[in-house]
Curated annotation (Swiss-Prot):
Cell compartments where the protein resides: Nucleus
Species this chain originates from: Oryza sativa subsp. japonica (Rice)
Name the record gives this protein: Homeobox protein knotted-1-like 9
GO molecular function, one term: DNA-binding transcription factor activity, RNA polymerase II-specific
InterPro entries per UniProt: ELK_dom, HD, Homeobox_CS, Homeodomain-like_sf, KN_HD, KNOX1, TALE_homeobox
Amino acid sequence: MESFASLAGGGSSSTTARLPELIPPENPDRISPPPLLYQLLAGSASSARHGHGHHHGGGGGAAAAAVQGLQVSPAGAEAAMKAEIMSHPQYSALLAAYLGCKKVGAPPDVLTKLTAVPAAQQQLDAADGHPRRRHEPRRDDDVPDHQLDQFMHADEVQGGAGAADPGSRGVLQLDSIADSNCEGTGSSEEEQDTSCPEAEEIDPSDKQLKHQLLMKYGGSLGDLRQAFSKRTKKGKLPKEARLKLLHWWELHYDKWPYPSEVEKMTLAQTTGLDQKQISNWFINQRKRHWKPTPVAGMTFPTVEAAGGGFRHSGHDGGLAAAAAAAALPLYMGSWPFVVDGMYRLGS
């Protein structure tokens, strides 16, 4: 960066002291130096050139001594940057967006303080007697600061207030999902261009309708999503219900492990299942795990191999009678018996 001496024309040859250079800001890519510093620099340079033309060297040293104390400190540069930002036409929008974000979820006392900030700022400006330039059009002699304009029009101004609204966040999320679904998967440019033609132009009324539907049915959609995530697999009963059915099965295993209609209703109330689910569970359980045990001292009918008639044998019968009894169990009285693989109730 050029020094004051070089801008003043070099001064006298006898002047060996170099004037201090301006300290650049910490982030020059975001905010440019304030125009006030350029005005001071231009005034110092013109006075130095005027002194050099009249005094032939003596004025140069006087100008150097006059601007010796004009070195800009970091604190002064920061204050000048703040003043430039506060005087920008978009400063009110930036302040409103920032306060809108802070108000989301704030306690009542903090919300009251945040609401009073704009009014207090206006009173402070009126007391200082320096109205902001946002109320005045830019003059022709003002140096345009494009970097500051870009900073003021960044996401802090345009998206700050919208990010604080939960409904706006939902709309932005839906927009991103729609954009991702409309991305073309083809390899050629024609396929990508024709993959989602309706995404090129979106009617503003559609956006408004989508926003209204989201605000109205957003809670119901969240409940449905939660219900689908907790949905059990098809054909598999809950663990607690299965434990209760298994407990009933073990208690009635020796007699007849199949509930009646009244018992099904009781089990349905305790397990939260319907009677059809209970019936299917007991049918599968009985087919897979139930093996009826004969009662001691009971006689079983056996089938004679030759004549096909029935013959009663005692408990100490032969092996053929025992095999026939195991293949065709029959319980007399009110006990059930098996015929052709089907369970029947005795009379």
